[in-house]
Amino acid sequence: MHSQTTKDEQSKDDSSNEKQDAIERRRLQNRLSQRNHRRKIRDRIAKLQERVIASELRAVATLNGWDQASPPAASMMESKPQGDFDSNPLASVSEDPAISNPPQRNVSSNLCRSCCSLLNQMPSSSSLPSPTSPLPFDLGLTNGVDSTNSSPSTLLNSSPSSSQLSPFSLDTSLSMTGLQSQNEFSFPPYPDPPGSQQYPHCPQYYVATEASLPHIMQRLGSATSHPKAIILIPHGHGYAPAPFTGANAADSTGLRSALNGNLNLQNPGRHCLRPDRSAKSSDLGTSGDWMTAPSSTPFCPLHPSQSSSLDNYQSMML
C-alpha cells in the first residue's frame, strides 16, 4: 500500500513538473518572439528614417539646384589661373566654344578679384548669367575676343557679324550712349538679343545718358516683357560721347578716338582696378594707350563702392 501511494505521488509530481516545464518553455518562447519582433520593428523604423532623410535631402537639392550634373561655367573658368586669359592667343580664343558662346562666357574678366571671389562662394543655383560687358568699355569681349590681345582692326572685323551680336555689343552700347550706329553701320535692330530666350528672367542692362533716355524708353517699350535695367549716367561726370570720325568700319583711328572719348571718366579715387590687364602688351603696342587712357578709369560693374562720383548713377528697372 505504501509503495503504491509513493508511486502515485511521484507520478503526480512528474506530471506537475512537466506542466510547469511546458509553461516555462512557452514563457521563454514568448519572450524570444517579443525580442525578435521588437528588433524587426527597430530595423524598420531605422530604414524608414533613412529613407525620409534621403528624400528630404533630394528635395532640398532639387529646390536649390544642387543636383545639376554640369558644373557652372564660372567655376570651370575660375579653376584656371588668372594669367591664362591674357596669355592665350587670338586663335585659341576664337576656337574655344566655351568663350565663343555668349551665355557661357566668364564674367571674371570684367570684374575685380574681390568680386570674383564672392561669385565663386555663391552656390550654383544663384549663379545667373551676368552680362559680360554691361558698360561699353570692353568691346572686344562681346564677341568672344580678348581686348588685350587683339588689335582695333580685329575688333572691328569681328563686331559686324549680326548672328553673334549680344545685348551688350557695339551696336547696342553706342546706340544707348547717343551714337546712332544704326545709320552708320546699318545694323538691324534686335529687340530680343540672342541668348535671352535661354534665361528669360535675367535682366538686360543698358547704358544711357539723360539726352538719349526718352528715345531708349520709347524703343524698349515695344520690346518683349524681359526684365531690363537702364544705367543712367548724368551730365557733369566727364562722360561726353566724342564724334565718331571713323564712318568706315576699317578706320581704327576713329574707333580709338571714340573709345578714348567715351572712356574719359573722371574718377580720382578708384577702388576696383585691373593692373594686370592694363600692364599687358599686345602685338600692335601697349593695350593701355587705346583701351584705357590715362584719364580713363576702368571700374567693376558689381563693386559696391567705387568713388563719390559714381554714387550718382541711377538704376531704373522697367
From Swiss-Prot:
Residues 20-52 form the bZIP domain. Keywords: DNA-binding, Nucleus, Transcription, Transcription regulation. InterPro entries: bZIP, bZIP_sf, Sec_Metab_Biosynth_Reg. GO terms for cellular component: nucleus. This is Xanthocillin biosynthesis cluster transcription factor xanC. It comes from Aspergillus fumigatus (strain ATCC MYA-4609 / CBS 101355 / FGSC A1100 / Af293) (Neosartorya fumigata). CDD domains: bZIP_YAP (cd14688). Disruption phenotype: Virtually eliminates the production of all pathway metabolites, including fumiformamide, melanocin E, melanocin F, but also the sulfated xanthocillin derivative BU-4704 and xanthocillin X monomethyl ether. SUPFAM superfamilies: Leucine zipper domain. Belongs to the bZIP family. The lineage of its organism: Eukaryota, Fungi, Dikarya, Ascomycota, Pezizomycotina. Residues 41-48 are annotated as: Leucine-zipper. It is found in: Nucleus. Residues 1-27 have a biased composition (Basic and acidic residues). Residues 123-139, 147-171 have a biased composition (Low complexity). GO terms for molecular function: DNA binding; DNA-binding transcription factor activity. Induction: Expressed during copper starvation via the regulation of both aceA and macA transcription factors.
